[in-house]
């Protein structure tokens, strides 16, 4: 690593024109002519790109790729929903819906091409526009809004065409309950539609053909029995509503019910055709027979639906009551076990408390006994110590008295000896005073000078004579002292 910070800084600021980016730069140079707001002179003269340009470019590329993936996923999901909602028995409606569902993909080609064009020229736009992140976000939001509006218009168009398509058969009094039931089953049970569609459509076609022939033959008799038919239609509508309410909660029974209704529709259509053919030549009273048969069949359906409702209610009540009973039993068992556990715990705690109190009482009594024993032992030890001290004191006093007596005797003997010695010294002094001279010490005289003065020489023998005569032990004498000179 170099020690010069400026060299490293300038080295990191060199132009980014490596061999790995040559292909990308060639594509950028080809597309630069199409950008009118690009300043080519500044790009060629610029040697040092702005700092963090590669980081911003990678960030923009990741954002655009992520937005494209999210947009494609949302587009495919919307197409799948539209295709599932737009499936109709008529081939003409399917073809028209498929052509319209293909239009968003064609319309989305232009914004995708614009995104590819923008990704190609992103590196060139970095040099002239160092901060295009906000414009890119605005561009993405505008494109998403346009795509959403296009998809909404296409879906609205398809729903309008579906609503304008003609009905595949007439809603007569004979098959009105079946048609309402089929519509309700198609809306509530979506997952079983594809399985039972082919079988149901075949049976429905037979019913439609027979019903159409019957209606064409009985056109003359419709005016006579219009009022009666209106009342029958109202009754059929109420019956169909009841059957719809019964078929909402059973998905598994819808398949068998559609199969049964298909066969029933075929039979009703055939009967209607026969009755309508004879109604052209008979009176108005004869025209009411198919309605009677229709009412009988509808009453039979209502009875079946009522039985199914009873069975469903019984089964539903059993399904609801069984978990409740089980839950109550489990909760009761848990409550019993919990109460027993709490009771045992409380009994155990009481016994533990009693045992603890007894133990504490025993410990307290034991402590009291030990304290009493300790106090007794202490008193005994103190008494023995006192007696021992008294004995020691008495013995000590006796020994002191003996010693004092001995000392007194010794002192008395010493005094006697001292007295005798003093008497002897006094006698000797008296003897010396009777046969010698007296000298009074003056000034700085000492025994040596006194011996020279009286004996003519200061020999040790002369000095010792003077000492012995005066009872002196040393050479110390004082002024004014009288000394006997032998």
UniProtKB/Swiss-Prot annotation:
Ranges for domain LysM: 437-485
Alphabetical list of PROSITE patterns matching this protein: LYSM
Entry keyword Chaperone: no
Keyword Transmembrane: yes
Domain of life, per lineage: Bacteria
Family annotation (CDD domains): LysM
UniProt keyword terms in alphabetical order: Cell membrane, Membrane, Transmembrane, Transmembrane helix
Residues exposed to the Extracellular side: 2-204, 341-486
Stretches for region Elastin-binding: 14-34
Sequence intervals crossing the membrane: 205-225, 320-340
Compositionally biased tracts (Polar residues): 64-85
Biased composition (Basic and acidic residues): 1-40, 103-118, 126-160, 180-199, 247-259, 299-314, 361-398
Pfam families: LysM
Localization of this protein: Cell membrane
Membrane topology: Multi-pass membrane protein
Chain spans, region Disordered: 1-314, 351-440
InterPro entries to which the protein is assigned, alphabetical: LysM_dom, LysM_dom_sf
Name of the molecule in the record: Elastin-binding protein EbpS
Organism (species): Staphylococcus aureus (strain MSSA476)
């Amino acid at each position: 690593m170099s020690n010069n910070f400026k060299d490293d800084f300038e080295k990191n600021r060199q132009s980014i024109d490596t061999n790995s980016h040559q292909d990308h730069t060639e594509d950028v140079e080809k597309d630069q002519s199409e950008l009118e707001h690009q300043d080519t002179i500044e790009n060629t003269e610029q040697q040092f790109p702005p700092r963090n340009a590669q980081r911003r470019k990678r960030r923009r590329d990741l954002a655009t790729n992520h937005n494209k993936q999210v947009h494609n996923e949302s587009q495919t999901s919307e197409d799948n929903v539209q295709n599932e909602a737009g499936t109709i028995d008529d081939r003409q409606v399917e073809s028209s819906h498929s052509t319209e569902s293909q239009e968003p993909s064609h319309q989305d080609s232009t914004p995708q091409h614009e995104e590819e064009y923008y990704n190609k020229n992103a590196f060139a736009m970095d040099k002239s526009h160092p901060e295009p992140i906000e414009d890119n976000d605005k561009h993405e939001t505008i494109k998403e809004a346009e795509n959403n509006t296009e998809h909404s218009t296409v879906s609205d168009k398809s729903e309008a065409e579906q609503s304008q398509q003609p009905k595949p058969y007439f809603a007569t009094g004979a098959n009105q309950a079946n048609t309402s039931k089929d519509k309700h089953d198609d809306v509530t049970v979506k997952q079983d539609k594809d399985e039972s569609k082919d079988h149901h459509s075949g049976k429905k076609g037979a019913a439609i053909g027979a019903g159409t022939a019957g209606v064409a033959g009985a056109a003359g008799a419709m005016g006579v029995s219009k009022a009666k038919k209106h009342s029958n239609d109202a009754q059929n509508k109420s019956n169909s509503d009841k059957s719809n309410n019964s078929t909402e909660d059973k998905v598994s029974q819808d398949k068998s019910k559609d199969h049964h209704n298909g066969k029933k529709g075929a039979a009703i259509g055939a009967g209607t055709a026969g009755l309508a053919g004879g109604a052209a030549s008979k009176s108005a009273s004869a025209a009411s027979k198919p309605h009677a048969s229709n009412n009988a069949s509808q009453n039979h359906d209502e009875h079946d639906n009522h039985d199914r409702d009873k069975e469903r209610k019984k089964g539903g009540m059993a399904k609801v009551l069984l978990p409740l009973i089980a839950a109550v039993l489990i909760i009761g068992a848990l409550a019993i076990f919990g109460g027993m556990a709490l009771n045992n715990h409380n009994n155990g705690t009481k016994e533990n408390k009693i045992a603890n109190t007894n133990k504490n009482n025993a410990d307290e009594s034991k402590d009291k006994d030990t304290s009493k024993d300790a106090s007794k032992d202490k008193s005994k030890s103190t008494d023995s110590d006192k007696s021992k001290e008294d004995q020691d004191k008495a013995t000590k006093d006796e020994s002191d008295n003996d010693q004092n007596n001995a000392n007194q005797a010794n002192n008395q003997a010493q005094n006697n000896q001292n007295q005798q010695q003093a008497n002897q010294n006094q006698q000797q002094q008296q003897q010396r005073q009777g046969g010698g001279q007296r000298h009074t010490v003056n000034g700085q005289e000492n025994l040596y000078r006194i011996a020279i003065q009286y004996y003519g020489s200061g020999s040790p023998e002369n000095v010792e004579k003077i000492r012995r005569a005066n009872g002196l032990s040393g050479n110390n004498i004082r002024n004014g002292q009288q000394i006997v000179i032998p």
